[in-house]
Amino acid sequence: MSSAQLLTAQQLAARLSEPDLLVLDCRFALEDPSYGARVYQENHIPGAHFADLERDLSAPVRKGVTGRHPLPDPAELALKLQAWGLRQDSQVVLYDDGPGAFAARAWWLLHWLGKRDGVYLLDGGLAAWKAAGLALTNGESSLRPGDFQGQPDASLLIDAATLQAQLGQPGLALLDARAQPRFRGEVEPIDPVAGHIPGAQCAAFTDNLGSDGRFLPPEQLHQRFSALLRGRPVDELVAYCGSGVTACHNLFALSLAGFPLPRLYAGSWSEWITDPRRPVATGD
């Protein structure tokens, strides 16, 4: 069974009282890093704990070395997950405002640490919860420490040097989750260099969603990624984006479609461009 699973707002509402349920609010805004904590204090799904992208789901940036959202230290992340109440047998539901990129980053981190069963994204995110007229609260969520012990799986990652050595190999499928204008290098609102890694294809993460903001059916996602793979093996696929966040949305969608989980270049574009010797491409 795929490790990527979805819950509807109504399904989550029916399970909120279950004692083994852990809900994490992953809301964030790249242009306003304090946004997530602020809106969590205003209202959130009852019982949810707040997981901040920069404070909890990333390590500190090392200027000129890392990308904008380096992977967190696995031992530190495991301790935070324990503090929120994660146990080995917990059911976990992750949400953000709706597109799911920040929730997908949390999903990938849990998968990386070995928590692969019973982890769900709220399909449509908080927007779907609100649209269903379900309750929100601004109250404190109770803490009951968990016993989760995670071990990172290095096979899920590829580093910059290894990726650079593989550029140009016919089997490599390199998928960039950013939107077309950033991929082509026409605009770059965040990073100091525009463009993409040579040989990459644009696979905008938003194309995993329907017009209602929910994930496309697995069959449609399978067609999408099969077309992008062009017959290449999925174990040669590498996902990246601007900083290792929206790429996780593509990885979740790949898993939802029934593909085995390929590798993530976690440093992504913002790390790639820290070394001017690495090649850069623009256009299609």
Swiss-Prot record:
Q: Which reaction does it catalyse?
A: 2-oxo-3-sulfanylpropanoate + [thioredoxin]-dithiol = [thioredoxin]-disulfide + hydrogen sulfide + pyruvate + H(+)
> Keywords of this protein's UniProt record, alphabetized?
Cytoplasm, Repeat, Transferase
- The record's active-site residues are 241
Check the record and name the Gene3D superfamilies matching this protein. Rhodanese-like domain
Q: Where is this region: Substrate specificity?
A: 241-247
* Main localization (coarse): cytoplasm
* Keyword ATP-binding carried by entry: no
Query: Know anything about its domains from the record?
Result: The N-terminal region is the non-catalytic domain; the C-terminus contains the active-site cysteine residue and the CGSGVTA motif probably responsible for substrate specificity.
- Recall the GO molecular function terms of this protein's record: 3-mercaptopyruvate sulfurtransferase activity; thiosulfate-cyanide sulfurtransferase activity
- Which cysteine-cysteine pairs are annotated as disulfide bonds in the entry? none
Chain sites annotated for binding substrate: 182
As recorded in Swiss-Prot or TrEMBL, the protein's gene is named sseA
What's the stated role of this polypeptide? Catalyzes the transfer of sulfur from 3-mercaptopyruvate to a thiol-containing acceptor to form an intramolecular disulfide releasing hydrogen sulfide and pyruvate.
Location comes to:
Cytoplasm
| Protein name, entry field | Probable 3-mercaptopyruvate sulfurtransferase
Q: Identify the domain of life.
A: Bacteria
**Stretches assigned to the Rhodanese domain:** 17-138, 168-281
Q: Which CDD domains match?
A: TST_Repeat_1, TST_Repeat_2
Identify the InterPro entries for this entry. Rhodanese-like_dom (IPR001763), Rhodanese-like_dom_sf (IPR036873), TST/MPST-like (IPR045078)
In short, the EC number is: 2.8.1.2
Q: Which residues cross the membrane?
A: none
State any GO CC term.
cytoplasm
Under Pfam families, the record lists: Rhodanese
